[in-house]
Every structure is written in structure tokens, then in C-alpha cells.
Amino acid sequence: MFLDQITIELRAGKGGNGVVAWRKEKYLPKGGPYGGNGGVGGSIIIESATHVYSFESYRNIRFLKAEDGRPGATNNRSGKNGKDLVLIVPEGTLLRDVETKEILYDFAKSGERLVVCRGGKGGKGNTFFKTSTNRAPTKATPGKPGEIRQVELELKLIADIGLVGFPNAGKSTLFNTLARTEVKVGAYPFTTLQPVLGLVPCQEKLYQKPWIIADIPGIIEGAHQNRGLGLDFLRHIERTRLLLFVIDICGCERSSPEEDLRILMDELVHYREDLADKNRIIALNKIDDLLPDERQERLESFQKLFPSETFVLVSGLTGEGVDLLNSLFTNKLAV
């Protein structure tokens, strides 16, 4: 499954120690101090990128450490600085300090960088302590420790595709078929109690990155007034690039499938008017319950009532129509 939250301890590198050394040359019996400073410890940097879409590369990692600085050397040579450790995370990553609960940064766009833990400063060699009154210092200092911080990385629900529908519309079954995974499915409302992310392979070979798909918990009429699971999940919808409305083509006792679609659209507009302009596809699901002629009749009814919408007949249970749906994702998103 999609890994969208991790806690990890980050340890910057320790600074290298300064050294005590003396200049030793044939004609300089009292050449004086010649010990170099230690190198700076490596820092830990977090950077966001578009080619990363989960925290999978950090799975089961409890801590990460940057390289220590090297000690100073003779001939007044400074030690080599430790290499910085750069963690690449997806766009939409929220960085939080575990101890203080403070949000350190919101990586909203690709290419953003933040130094999370700074490496320790290098110690001073005895050359540093030479003065007019102390010509032969024997003092050197150790390197400083690097910063240590335990952080939580959370991927905000920034998905390419968001599945929207009433409870029991078959969203989770369709999600499982698209993402080739297994989300809990049941014949009762709100099987999905929190958003679930998955990956849908893109059929366009030139587009290497899979689509991130989100199964949003079922919306009910009045969700914009915080009924049901309410506003928390409507907020997730605004962060998606494409909405996939999932409609039970057979309808339910309460209303017709056409009325279900109208209510869903109204809920989104009541929550935020600009959601009406978001790219969308309407999946008429559970066609396995209908004969071919009945499917076509229902499709024509929808097309007549909603002439500007894109419809596709699918069955999350049998997989019928899923390839066509995937090609529509490519047409809508691979731009």
C-alpha cells in the first residue's frame, strides 16, 4: 500500500576534531603550531520533487545520519567537511517536529529545500590559538555535535484522481480494481472511514509516473454542512487534479442514479463554487447488474440530462470498462 506517513530521527554529522601539530622542517627547529581545524559535519536537507510520490524509500528506517566532519591534519590542513544528506520527498509533504508538534515546513511545490538539522562545527587546531604571548599553544578543541531532531513526514492528500460518491456506490471495489490492491469493502455505509491512496499504472508509455488515486469516504447529502463524515473529506477533494464521480447505475431506494449525481455536484458547489470547474469523469458503476440494453438506456438518460459530462460504463466487480476509464485518465491528465 501507499506509504504516506513516517516518523524518523534525523542526525546531522558531528564536526571533526581540531588537532595539535607542529611545523617540522629542517631549518625550523621551533616552527610553531601547525595543527588544522576539523571539518564541519554534514547537514540533513529535505527537498521536494515531482518524481517521488510516496515515502516508500524510507520504509522501516528508524533514523538517518549525515556524515561526520574529518579531523584536522598537520601542515595546518583543515579536515574534510562531512557530506550533506538530502532526503527527497513528494510535493505536498508536511514536515512536523515530533516533540514540539510544530509544523516546520509545507513542501507545496517541487524544488523546495529546507535544512532540518545542521552539522556540528569543526573543532579548532592549535594554530588557531597562537597569539603574540602564546607562541606554542598546546590546545585544540573537539568538534561540536550535529543537531538531532525527530520528525514526522506526512503526505497531504494531493492526488491525481479523487473518487467521489455516495456510500455503497462501489467506490472501494472500483478503487481496488484500478489500484490493484485490497481496501475493505462491505455492504454498509462508510466502509471507507478515511482517505486511502493507491497507484494506477498509466497506459501512456511516455508518462512513467503512475497516477495517484484517492478513495474519499462516502459523501452524503448535507456534507457541506458537516453532516456524515463532512467537511474533513470535502477538503481532500480540492487537492485532486481530476474527480471521478462513482454512481451506482441501478440507483437506490432513496433516489434515482441521475438524482444521486445531481446531489453530489450540488454538495461540491455548496462547499466551494470553483469545484464545479474541476476536471471530472462520471463512472456509471455496477453495470454487471444490468443487461446490455438496460446499460445503454441508462447511459443515454444521463447523456441527455448532463450533455457536457464525460460518462463511462464500468464494473468494479468484473473490471469491465476499466481499460477505457484508464485511457480517459491519460487523456485528461497527461498534459
Curated annotation (Swiss-Prot):
> What is the name of this protein?
GTPase Obg
CDD domains, sorted:
Obg (cd01898)
| Annotated organism of origin | Chlamydia abortus (strain DSM 27085 / S26/3)
EC number(s) on file? 3.6.5.-
Q: Which InterPro entries match?
A: G_OBG (IPR031167), GTP-bd (IPR006073), GTP-bd_Obg/CgtA (IPR014100), GTP1_OBG_dom (IPR006169), GTP1_OBG_dom_sf (IPR036726), OBG_GTPase (IPR045086), P-loop_NTPase (IPR027417)
User: Keyword Cell inner membrane, does the record have it?
Assistant: no
Q: Where in the cell is it found?
A: Cytoplasm
Ranked from the top, the taxonomy reads: Bacteria, Pseudomonadati, Chlamydiota, Chlamydiia, Chlamydiales
Which parts of the sequence belong to the OBG-type G domain? Answer: 159-334
Cofactors: Mg(2+)
Q: What are the GO MF terms of this UniProt record?
A: GTP binding; GTPase activity; magnesium ion binding; ribosome binding
Keyword annotations from UniProtKB, A to Z = Cytoplasm, GTP-binding, Hydrolase, Magnesium, Metal-binding, Nucleotide-binding
